[in-house]
């Protein structure tokens, strides 16, 4: 099973900006590793939440399209809300 997500570059940083994203059904994330600079991105919460229900999400290489460029990544870390079934933040490492 392959996973492909559309993302946009995140310009606003910080707690307030992240809270606004989460309130609007989005989740902040970061892509790092390899020879490129880290990129802060925004993903659709529901699409990622549905995909993470599959075991393959954690083991396979995922494709994230950021500004028209495809990034091959693996999930490095996921932060979840302690009481709600919500994702708070994701870390991806370039494959």
From Swiss-Prot:
Belongs to the bacterial ribosomal protein bL25 family. GO terms for molecular function: 5S rRNA binding; structural constituent of ribosome. Part of the 50S ribosomal subunit; part of the 5S rRNA/L5/L18/L25 subcomplex. Contacts the 5S rRNA. Binds to the 5S rRNA independently of L5 and L18. It comes from the Bacteria. CDD domains: Ribosomal_L25_TL5_CTC. Gene3D superfamilies: Ribosomal Protein L25, Chain P. HAMAP family: Ribosomal_bL25 (MF_01336). The keyword Chaperone does not apply. This is Large ribosomal subunit protein bL25. Keywords: Ribonucleoprotein, Ribosomal protein, RNA-binding, rRNA-binding. The keyword rRNA-binding applies. GO terms for cellular component: cytosolic large ribosomal subunit. GO terms for biological process: translation. SUPFAM superfamilies: Ribosomal protein L25-like (SSF50715).
């Amino acid at each position: 099973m392959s996973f492909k997500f559309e993302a946009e570059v995140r310009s606003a940083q910080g707690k307030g900006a992240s809270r606004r994203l989460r309130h609007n059904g989005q989740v902040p994330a970061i892509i790092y590793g390899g020879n490129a600079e880290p990129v802060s991105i925004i993903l659709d919460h529901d699409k990622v939440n549905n995909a993470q229900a599959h075991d393959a999400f954690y083991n396979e290489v995922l494709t994230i399209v950021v500004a028209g460029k495809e990034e091959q990544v693996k999930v490095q870390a996921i932060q979840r809300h302690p009481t709600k079934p919500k994702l708070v933040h994701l870390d991806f490492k370039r494959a």
